[in-house]
Every structure is written in structure tokens, then in C-alpha cells.
């Protein structure tokens, strides 16, 4: 914990560093690093600079475990009948043992998620689903408390219980068969800084969990999870440097794969902070075809073929079949494009959804239809735009991006038997997306 410092001092130091960089005096570098404004890598912390810019220059701040925080000096907090203001002072290392005082301080750090709904969904999941070999083992879930194991979730979190562990615990209260899953640890007290740390870690971890489930399809794993951390999670919820294994550790003592992650899909994400909510809705897992269709629709579309003069009925059959295939591919692509922004419909295709389609190679078939709907020139132009836009997500799927370079680029998806979309219909897609019931 650092000593309080005026915002103006840090802003002036940052301005000087920005103009002189490595030539800045050593005391400037030390000051900025001490307060987390300048990272050891030599880059400014976007989180810290954004926080400073939102404060008046006469305010004072300190560095906590969670980053910069406004310092509030309270000489007589009981004036005018007000509640004691929450202060971060040198006494923050002293443990508080009075439960009512802990509650007062805890209430200033609230969760913005529907905890009751999460609890209800977990209860329903536990009643109806068997986890088999992925079930929790004895003592795997650690619950910390201040002498009252029946306390509310926020109090358990304040005591140091991890958020997913706490959710499982409060959802399984009264289930005597599950008591052996929990290792109970009584905490005698907690200091100011740990109250803030425990709750803020839980808040950022649960928000990251929502983003990862909605956009990547699952909770973060431990050391074996090689997926990339979304930029939003790194820059908005953390301070740039975080791994999936770290987020996993903040969520639960037990392996996160054992938590019934599908319950997150049952929660009204509009209760989340607006930025987190928007990010969840923007890129829902299982809906690559929707994003592909929206992107591809701006490139040259095939036209139906016209019969040659004097064509015989026999020679017209292949042409009619080709035209039907062109017509179907365009209809599929155009319908998928209408699903852009329809996050509730898209949620039905999420890998954890009970309503996800059971058609084998479903996304591959839709991708084939989208590619088939474009002319050869349209496909080439689309690939060039993907390269120009540096869209790594699209480039990583060769079925959509193709292989080769320039005019010689090819799309093997068009010849894969498993990508045949003849059994896909727009009416069928409407049923899969639940259009009739939700739009």
C-alpha cells in the first residue's frame, strides 16, 4: 500500500515522461512505477491513466492491490449523522473483527449480477443433472466465513471465498449429501484492503466469466487452457496482463470445468455493467456463420443461369438444379445476415445451450452455402478484404478464407461431401434460431 499522493503530481510526472521517455529523471520513473502508472515494460497503464483522467487534480490517490484508488481522509465521519466514509489509510493492515463493521465496508463494493437467479439456476442444474466423472470431490470447494457458515454470498466473498465456490455452496445448502464437498475455514477478521480486494477480484472474475462463456463457449481452464484472453477482458476488466489460468484461479479453488457453466446462459445479462453486457452480446459462441454471412453479403453475389437458345428439356435439368442451389445458398446467407444483433436468437446456438442444433457439421454446411452464394470474383474480393482488415478470426478458418493467394485462391469447402447444405432450409433455420417465438 502506497502513501497518498495528489493526482496533479502523477499527471505532471506522466506528462514529463511522455515528452522525454527514457531521458526522464530517475525520480519520475520511480514515482510512476510506484503508483502503477508506468509498467515495468516501459508502457503506460491504460487503466491507471484512465482512472487519473476522471479525477480532479486536487484529489489524492493511493495504490492498492487492485490498482489506483481515491484516498478519502475522514477526520470526523459522524458529522451530520452520516455513515462513516470508506477510507483507505495506513490502518488498512489492521484486521477488523466486528461483523457489522465488515458488512458496512462490504456494502460499498456491490455485485452487479443477479445472484439469486444464478443460485436458482445452479439449484435446478444440481437437481436434474449428474456430473459423473466431472463431479466435485471431497473438500475440493473451500468456503471461508467469519464464524457463520450460513452467511450471505457477499459475506463469504469478503472472507475470501472464491465466487464460483460461493455460488455452488449457497445453492447446495440443505443438501446433506453434498456437505463433504466443502472444506470450511473460519476467518477471524479481515483488513480494509482485503475487503476491497476480495470483492473486486470476485467482481472482475465473474464478469470475465460471462464474457468468456458467451464469446468463447466455456469458462477459463487452468494451465492447460491455450485460448487467447479477449482484448476486452485484458483492457477493461484487468490491467492488460492476465492469463486464463489466473482468471480461473480467481473464480474457484476447484477446476472450473466442474462448475455447471450453462447456468450463465439463463441469466439476464442486461443486469451486468453495460460494457460487459454489450461485449457478451456482440460475439456469441456458436454463431460464426452469422458473422460470415454479414461480412460476405457485401461482395458480388451469383446470378441464376439462363438457358442456352434451343436447349432441350434434358439439358435444362442440370441448369435448373444449379439455379435451385444458387437460390438456396443466397436465401440461407440472407437469413443468417438478419440474425446479426439478434443475440437472444443467437444464444440458442451456443455450445452450452439446451437448444443447440444437432445437425452434424452444421456450421460447415452454412459456411459452404455462404461461399457458394458468391461469384468467384466475389470470393477473391472478400479474401482480399479479410487480409486488408487483418481479421485473424476469419483468416484462421480456411473453409471461409480459402487457400492460396490472389486469383488462384481456392475454397475446398465447396467440394467437401460433409459440407453439402442440400438438407438445410430457411424454415429449418428459423426453427433453430427460434425466430417465430422471439421476433
Curated annotation (Swiss-Prot):
It holds the Pfam family Nucleocap_ssRNA. The keyword Transferase does not apply. It is found in: Virion; Host cytoplasm. Its main location: virion. GO terms for cellular component: helical viral capsid; host cell cytoplasm; ribonucleoprotein complex; viral nucleocapsid. GO terms for molecular function: RNA binding. The keyword Ribonucleoprotein applies. Keywords: Capsid protein, Helical capsid protein, Host cytoplasm, Ribonucleoprotein, RNA-binding, Viral nucleoprotein, Virion. Belongs to the ophiovirus nucleocapsid family. Encapsidates the genome, protecting it from nucleases. The encapsidated genomic RNA is termed the nucleocapsid (NC) and serves as template for viral transcription and replication. This is Nucleoprotein. It comes from Citrus psorosis virus (isolate Spain/P-121) (CPsV).
Amino acid at each position: 500500500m502506497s502513501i497518498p499522493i495528489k493526482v496533479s503530481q502523477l499527471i505532471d510526472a506522466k506528462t514529463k515522461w511522455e515528452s522525454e521517455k527514457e531521458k526522464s529523471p530517475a525520480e519520475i520513473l520511480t514515482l510512476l512505477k510506484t503508483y502503477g502508472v508506468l509498467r515495468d515494460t516501459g508502457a503506460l497503464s491504460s487503466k491507471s491513466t484512465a482512472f487519473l483522467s476522471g479525477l480532479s487534480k486536487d484529489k489524492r490517490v493511493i495504490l492498492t492491490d487492485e490498482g489506483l484508488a481515491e484516498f478519502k481522509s475522514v477526520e470526523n465521519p459522524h458529522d451530520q449523522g452520516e455513515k462513516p466514509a470508506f477510507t483507505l489509510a495506513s490502518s488498512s493492515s489492521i484486521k477488523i473483527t466486528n461483523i457489522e463493521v465488515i458488512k458496512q465496508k462490504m456494502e460499498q463494493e456491490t455485485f452487479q449480477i443477479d445472484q439469486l437467479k444464478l443460485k436458482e439456476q445452479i439449484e435446478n442444474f444440481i437437481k436434474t443433472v449428474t456430473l459423473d466423472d466431472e463431479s466435485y470431490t471431497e473438500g475440493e470447494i473451500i468456503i471461508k466465513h467469519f464464524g457463520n457458515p450460513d452467511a450471505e454470498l457477499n459475506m463469504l466473498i469478503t472472507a475470501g471465498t472464491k465466487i464460483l465456490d460461493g455460488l455452488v455452496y449457497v445453492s447446495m445448502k440443505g443438501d446433506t449429501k453434498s456437505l463433504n464437498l466443502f472444506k470450511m475455514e473460519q476467518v477471524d477478521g479481515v483488513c480494509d484492503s482485503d475487503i476491497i480486494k476480495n470483492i473486486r477480484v470476485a467482481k472482475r472474475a465473474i464478469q470475465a466469466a460471462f464474457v468468456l462463456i458467451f464469446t468463447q463457449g466455456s469458462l477459463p481452464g487452468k494451465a492447460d487452457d491455450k485460448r487467447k484472453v479477449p482484448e476486452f477482458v485484458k483492457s477493461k476488466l484487468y490491467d492488460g496482463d492476465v492469463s486464463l489460468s489466473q482468471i480461473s484461479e480467481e473464480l474457484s479453488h476447484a477446476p472450473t470445468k466442474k462448475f455447471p457453466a450453462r447456468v450463465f446462459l439463463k441469466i439476464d445479462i442486461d443486469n451486468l455493467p453495460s460494457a460487459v453486457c454489450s461485449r457478451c452480446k456482440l460475439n456469441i459462441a456458436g454463431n460464426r456463420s452469422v458473422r460470415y454471412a454479414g461480412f460476405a453479403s457485401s461482395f458480388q453475389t451469383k446470378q441464376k443461369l439462363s438457358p442456352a437458345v434451343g436447349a432441350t428439356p434434358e439439358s435444362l435439368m442440370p441448369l435448373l438444379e444449379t439455379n435451385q442451389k444458387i437460390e438456396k445458398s443466397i436465401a440461407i446467407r440472407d437469413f443468417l445476415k438478419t440474425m446479426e444483433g439478434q443475440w437472444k436468437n443467437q444464444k440458442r446456438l451456443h455450445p452450452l445451450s439446451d437448444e443447440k442444433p444437432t445437425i452434424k457439421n452444421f456450421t460447415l454446411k452454412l459456411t459452404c452455402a455462404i461461399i457458394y452464394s458468391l461469384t468467384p470474383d466475389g470470393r477473391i474480393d472478400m479474401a482480399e478484404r479479410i487480409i486488408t482488415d487483418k481479421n485473424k478470426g476469419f483468416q484462421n478458418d480456411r473453409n471461409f478464407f480459402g487457400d492460396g493467394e490472389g486469383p488462384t485462391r481456392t475454397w475446398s469447402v465447396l467440394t467437401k461431401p460433409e459440407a453439402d447444405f442440400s438438407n438445410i432450409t430457411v424454415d429449418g433455420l428459423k426453427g433453430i434460431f427460434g425466430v417465430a417465438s422471439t421476433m
